[in-house]
Regions:
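ATP-binding Walker
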Residues: 52-53
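Loop/turn-to-beta-strand initiation segments
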Residues: 103, 162-165, 191-198
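C-terminal lobe/lid and adjacent interdomain/linker elements of RecA-like ASCE P-loop ATPase modules
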Residues: 178-196, 203-253
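GG-anchored amphipathic helix commonly corresponding to the ABC/SMC/Rad50 NBD signature/C-loop
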Residues: 138, 142, 146-170, 178-190
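Conserved P-loop NTPase mechanochemical-coupling segment
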Residues: 116-146
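Phosphate-binding P-loop
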Residues: 31-42, 159-161, 189
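N-terminal pre-Walker A segment at the start of P-loop NTPase domains
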Residues: 2-36
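ABC ATPase nucleotide-binding domain signature region
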Residues: 44-46, 56-124
Length: 253
């Protein structure tokens, strides 16, 4: 995929980091595979894999290593409800280009409610109080006053901008199939404007983004795969081609 160049070209072990030893998350094959480094696409990089394969652990570690809040938001978000992120980020080295992002954001589906609540807490509470409304950058409307999917799209349409670095953890969790298409279109606009995405997803729709790099997290570590070979695509196609057969196998006593 051709762009003006990636903000982060690759991710490697930091000096002295030991991968593949110890407990969680080092015991995950996908994490251990980082010992060999991971190249990122200058446009869109996807991580796919079963629940528990480590893709969300990787996304979180990449975002934290880039200076973002572990629970979501930008580098300026200072809230914390539970210190649950792993120590993996401290063991990573981001190989950056000379380009620097104009903006950045870490979108976590599981903690987006907390992110929205933090934004609400930053709003002026008294008439005439100094400081602008932080929600202006998110469409001017409370994210809590919208559906989960609407608030996700409000974030992408309003807060995300050109020359941005964005980490998304399962954004499809809040989106209908139709809005997954909207998400792909918005990503395309932002990549054309110099942005870079790293996305963990189960969505065959998002994975169809043209020219994206897809890594599958599995028992053998991290493997680069084509769209047609990605597990979410294969399983979805198989089910849609023969739903009765799949259901018969699943529901047999």
């Amino acid at each position: 995929m051709e762009t003006d160049g990636a903000f982060i070209k690759s991710i490697e072990p930091a000096d002295g980091a030991a991968f593949g030893s110890g407990g969680y998350p080092w015991s995950l094959p996908a994490v251990a595979a980082l010992a060999d480094g991971l190249e990122l696409d200058p446009g869109v990089t996807f991580l796919v894999g079963e629940n528990g394969s480590g893709k969300s652990t990787l996304i979180e570690a990449f975002a934290v290593a880039a200076g973002l809040n572990p629970e979501g938001g930008s580098r300026n978000f200072q809230f914390s409800t539970r210190d649950s992120h792993s120590a993996l980020s401290a063991s990573l080295k981001l190989n950056r280009s000379l380009r620097r992002p104009r903006t950045d954001f870490f979108l976590r589906a599981e903690s987006f409610f907390t992110t929205a609540t933090y934004l609400e807490s930053l709003r002026p509470t008294e008439p005439g109080e100094r400081g602008g409304d932080p929600l202006a950058a998110y469409g001017g409307r409370s994210l809590h006053e919208q559906s989960h999917g609407q608030s996700f799209l409000a974030l992408m349409m309003n807060r995300f901008g050109a020359d941005g670095l964005y980490f998304l953890d399962e954004p499809e969790a809040a989106l209908s199939a139709q809005n997954c298409f909207t998400c792909v279109r918005r990503m395309h606009q932002l990549v054309a404007d110099g942005s870079q995405f790293v996305v963990a997803t189960h969505s065959p729709i998002l994975l169809a983004y043209p020219g994206a790099t897809i890594y599958e997290c599995g028992e053998d570590g991290l493997a680069r795969v084509d769209y047609d070979d990605a597990e979410p695509v294969r399983l979805t196609r198989g089910f849609l081609a023969a739903p009765e057969r799949y259901l018969r196998m699943l529901l047999e006593d």
